[in-house]
From Swiss-Prot:
GO terms for molecular function: RNA binding. It is found in: Cytoplasm. GO terms for biological process: trans-translation. Belongs to the SmpB family. The gene is smpB. It comes from Idiomarina loihiensis (strain ATCC BAA-735 / DSM 15497 / L2-TR). GO terms for cellular component: cytosol. InterPro entries: SmpB, SsrA-bd_prot, SsrA-bd_prot_CS. Required for rescue of stalled ribosomes mediated by trans-translation. Binds to transfer-messenger RNA (tmRNA), required for stable association of tmRNA with ribosomes. tmRNA and SmpB together mimic tRNA shape, replacing the anticodon stem-loop with SmpB. tmRNA is encoded by the ssrA gene; the 2 termini fold to resemble tRNA(Ala) and it encodes a 'tag peptide', a short internal open reading frame. During trans-translation Ala-aminoacylated tmRNA acts like a tRNA, entering the A-site of stalled ribosomes, displacing the stalled mRNA. Its main location: cytoplasm. Coiled coil: none annotated. The keyword Transferase does not apply. It comes from the Bacteria. CDD domains: SmpB. This is SsrA-binding protein.
Amino acid sequence: MSKKKPQQSSNTIARNKKARHEYFLEDKFEAGVSLQGWEIKSIRAGKVNISDSYVIIKNGEAYLLGAEIQPLNQASSHVYCEPDRSRKLLLKRRELDKLIGASEREGYSIVATTIYWKGPWAKLEIFLAQGKKSHDKRDTIKERDWQRQKARIMKHSVR
């Protein structure tokens, strides 16, 4: 008998599923996040929401806005916990320059899609994204439905 490997839990903490529906995701970047102690504890407990989050560039630095990290009930009373504060993103200069140049173009924005663990550090997956128009969203939905229907037809035709 072979030994069973212990199941590894997923490193993903939270996802922004709405981003794939709202944007054409183009370039992917991995950024570290500058967090306080209570935020790390809350993230470990899974009390994070990045569904409406986005990245802005201010004074040559990237900041995450709209991410909500709820403080734990056991949080220290001498520290003021602000769930909606802006958090600095840690990127290499070359990546930051690329984001600055691209975000200044018309119709492009920087969207956070996933927050996950990489070793002991919380990392944020961000994309350079272009907004979809409503007809693009409808086309995406039609294509997805057609793929589902095609798979269903192929499954039944094999029998």
